[in-house]
């Protein structure tokens, strides 16, 4: 039997007792959708590791957070005024957080993260663009983790880098480095 799975399957990595699940942008686009995600996780405790996308479209003509972040990064790279674009992103997260009764603290954390990313080095525009765009998933994960905790589920936000995910530095063609897979198995130990 050929196993093309990049994760070693052995006594420490029993895929039958733990599930890793990914929820796309539509699944985390609104508070109502995040509540559905929570229901799925609550109903099946074997879902131990959750990966989420940036909030997607809530309705047909809506704008995805990723598209907002692309506009924000482009404006920043061109040296244009960015406050309106930044407010648009923060407001989307604030709407979700408010509807989940999460309070202002999580929004302050997200705003600080976005401002830190916007103030980062722009000498490599592609890398700047990628790291700002990646904030969509990262900040979505923060909201989901806080919400899950608020309803009594054990949840912990883990930054992908802290989890062991290492990537190349090819702008807009980022891929996980092979050594990431062994590092990510340590995440299973925590789950």
Model-inferred region functions:
Residues 1-2, 9:
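Short hydrophobic transmembrane-like helices used for membrane targeting/insertion
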Residues 7-191:
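Nucleotide/pyrophosphate-binding catalytic subdomain
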């Amino acid at each position: 039997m050929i196993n093309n799975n990049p994760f070693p399957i052995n006594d420490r990595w029993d895929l039958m007792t733990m599930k890793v699940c990914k929820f796309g942008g539509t699944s985390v686009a609104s508070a109502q959708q995040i509540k559905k995600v929570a229901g799925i996780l609550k109903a099946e405790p074997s879902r131990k590791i959750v990966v989420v996308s940036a909030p997607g479209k809530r309705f047909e003509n809506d704008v995805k957070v990723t598209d907002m972040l692309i506009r924000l990064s482009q404006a920043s790279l061109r040296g244009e005024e960015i406050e309106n674009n930044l407010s648009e992103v923060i407001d989307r997260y604030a709407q979700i957080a408010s509807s989940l009764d999460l309070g202002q603290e999580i929004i302050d954390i997200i705003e600080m993260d976005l401002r830190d990313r916007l103030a980062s080095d722009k000498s490599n525009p592609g890398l700047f663009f990628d790291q700002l765009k990646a904030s969509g998933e990262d900040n979505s994960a923060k909201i989901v983790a806080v919400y899950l905790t608020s309803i009594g589920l054990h949840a912990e936000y883990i930054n992908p880098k802290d989890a062991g995910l290492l990537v190349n530095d090819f702008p807009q063609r980022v891929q996980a480095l092979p050594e990431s897979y062994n590092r990510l198995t340590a995440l299973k130990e925590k789950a």
